Amino acid sequence: DSSTSRGLGDVYKRQKYYNPQAPGDQNSGMNIITMRYADILLMYAEAVHETSGMTEEVWNKTIRPIRERAGFTADAALNFPAGKSKEEMRQIIRDERRVEMAMEGLRWYDIKRWKAGNEYLSGKVRGASFVDENKLDTRKFEEARDYLWAVPISEINLNPNLAPNNPGYGN
């Protein structure tokens, strides 16, 4: 898969917003970035791929500069992977987004936009352990409920035309 070709496996090293010279644990003084250029490039790569297919030209303007900025130099990581199917290329772009945007709070929205909840949000919970108290071992993504938020009851009370609530939520 594409994370293996990047030499990452399943390991993430948290470097975002980290300043090794800052005193204390959370005193970096670095501003939180709400949107990054890499996010724009990845959205563009995804949109082009879904509408007309990824090309080497688009790859070299989007994915390649992201990987170069991250320090990759191997041809396997930088060069356009010619001969991939539409689905394989889609997965490469999604994996790139997963790695590049890690811990920035966008993954949930990506999965919902892709309508890929059953693939990514069901089954065994994997990933880093941040808090030992979390004992969730498995989860079940429910398509009818989990792609939409509940309409707040206060809004339904103000405007009864909003009833009934979205599937999976009471009124």
Predicted region positions:
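Short, well-ordered junction/capping motifs at the entry into regular secondary structure
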Residues: 1-2
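Acidic/polar-rich alpha-helix caps and helix-coil junctions
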Residues: 5-171
